[in-house]
Amino acid sequence: MDYLIELNQWGIKEGLPTKPYVDADYIQADKNIQGINNALQYAASNNYSEVILPKGNYALCYPREIVMVSNLDFNLNGSTLKVIYDSNKKSPFDNRTTTDYYNFKGNSIVFSKVTNSNLFGGTIIGCRDDRSFYNPLEVAMENTYGTLFQKSSNYCSVKNCKVRDYMGDNISFSSNSIFDYGEFDQGLTLSALDYNTGQPITSTNTLTTKMLNIPQDLTPKITSFLIAGAGYARTTNLNSKDLDIFFYDNNNNFIGVMKKRRIYTDISIPVNAMKFRLQFYNENNVNKNLQYTIMFGGIPHHNTVEKCEVFNGHRGGITLGGNYNEVINNKIRDNGKGLVRFLDGKPIFNNPTRYSINMEDSYGASCTIKDNEIYGSYHGILVGCYDVLIEHNHIYNIDYLAINLYSLMHATIKDNFLYNCQNNIGLMTSNFSAAFVNIIENSFTGGNMNLTNDSYRVSLSNNQYVNPDFVTLGDNCTFDNNHIIFTENPTTTPWIKANKIRKCTFKSVLTQREMTFKVKEYDSCKFENLRVRSENPNTQNVDVCEFTRSEFLNCELRNHLFSGRPMNIRVTKSKLIDTTCEVGITNVDNQVPYTTLEDCAISINTKNNLFLSDTNRPYTTYIVEKCNVTIDNPAFAALLASGAAAGVNELILKDNGFVYTGTAPLNLKYYTNKNHIRNFINSNNTFTNINLPAVN
């Protein structure tokens, strides 16, 4: 049953005043809010399911809020709600004694302690639209919000709305509850509780609290609570993130125990429980600050922001938090601006924490960011939570970090398309002992990726990188089944750093171009139309990189030392098609880099050489062992193009089969100039349809 708000009955006036605003304008805006709230309460009391606002423009002001009501939908019906504001003049509702009028703050629409409440179908405009920024300090203001989910609200939504121009965030989730125990007397003792009786027993590695009361006078009545963190990171200071909860009745009689409950998960309260005790594993210091908060009623959960356009937020677009909340299928644009600060002529927030979506200050668990279009912000998604799913978003034109992970336990970043972002994904330090990030089936065009923080285990698989600047991975990263492709020629040489890569492909579509690899191990990888330059990630030590079961098509496998110590190359059980191997030294003494091809299938169709020497210091080594070499090019010149310096090359051929496929035998040269050869070994090789040189 629907209720159409009767404007005159509730003292609501349609229409927006013009600046400069007078006190009467603010008073009417405040009456509008009161009238809407009274209409919502009337509808709820009379069993209406939906309240409809007559289509029009309506003024709002701070600090009074539109308060959403449980089990009631609020249909804005295409209306516009706008906050009227003057940075340079005091509002009649500003009770502060200071003259910094631009710091007068408020929220517009609030979901607080409600369930099944839905807002949809209109435009909500914040105070930034009216602000003058005449005082340069005004750019630091970050405390007004459009719609706010708070205090355990659940199963609520904002849908099909435009929300814009608030100083903090256009939409925000606050990870608070109906009632919190923060800093309180825990009465910690070094003991345990018996699982059968709930009574204390001796222990040397568990801490238990004293008997704690469950609040009975809260509205709505609480049926659950959760253990959250405290402080900036909100990950707690518990050695174990699991704990036991023992429940008791009003006479301290034991009811039962819930074992091994994780932080940030709801804990149901037994119907007759009045008290409880907590038991913490792997703890023995009764004076330790455990940094946890008990949140009665839980934090906002299972709420949704869907099919909204969220833009022009001064600091950011959406602050996400709570548990199981979703931001899905929205356009989130031009919030927390950077390079596009000129869009509306207003200055940007004075802190680099400007973003589209942020969970940095609203810790929670199991939130979802999915199917959104995100662009035009300084940062894209900043995530700090227990676990999060970031899936199927289109994120582009981000000035700095597209996705940045703060402290978290688990993140899945899946099936996203990122384009023209300076940094695609970044990692900060995790405060969990087993943090895991799964990056799968994404497409990254341009930008770089730095995942060197080893406090996470990171899996990257089935991703595509188009024209990346660089990808650098830490020791705890795996890089499997990824595809890197270059469709244009960048201004700098791209590079990748990893311990091991598996089943990955690397390709240049246009001209053969160079990519630097700081990788020790390759398994089942494919390289096409690239100069694959191996470089030692640790220039203080000689090292070897190994290519196993890999394939090179029209490549140059480059092992060139310009400084430090060499990264020698060993290729085994692989295919080389029209690929040359270059070994070189430029002005580095006392180093002897080498490249080895072992048990490989080598096909030469267009190249004139298998090896290239580019060295001015002795010496470089080229080894071919147990390989099958098929030559189809009648113009093939020599196995080794031996460069220009005297005595700087060593060529070793052992147990190979060489075959020329032409009709007449090929006149083969081992090397182009004997004077360039330091040492040559030709042992147990077979040559078919090939004329060998008379003098080796």
Segment roles from a protein language model:
Residues 182, 199-201, 228-260:
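Extracellular ligand-binding interfaces
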Residues 70-80, 102-135, 149-166, 302, ...:
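Parallel beta-helix/beta-solenoid
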Residues 12-52:
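Acidic Gly/Asp/Thr-rich repetitive segments characteristic of extracellular carbohydrate-active
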Residues 33, 37, 47-105, 124:
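N-terminal extracellular ligand-recognition/capping segment immediately after the signal peptide
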Residues 179-205, 212-216, 256-311, 370:
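Extracellular polysaccharide-targeting segments
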Residues 206-243, 265, 269-271, 626:
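Extra-cytoplasmic beta-strand recognition segments
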Residues 62-64, 83-88, 128-134, 145, ...:
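Short glycine/acidic-rich loop motifs that flank beta-strands on beta-rich extracellular proteins
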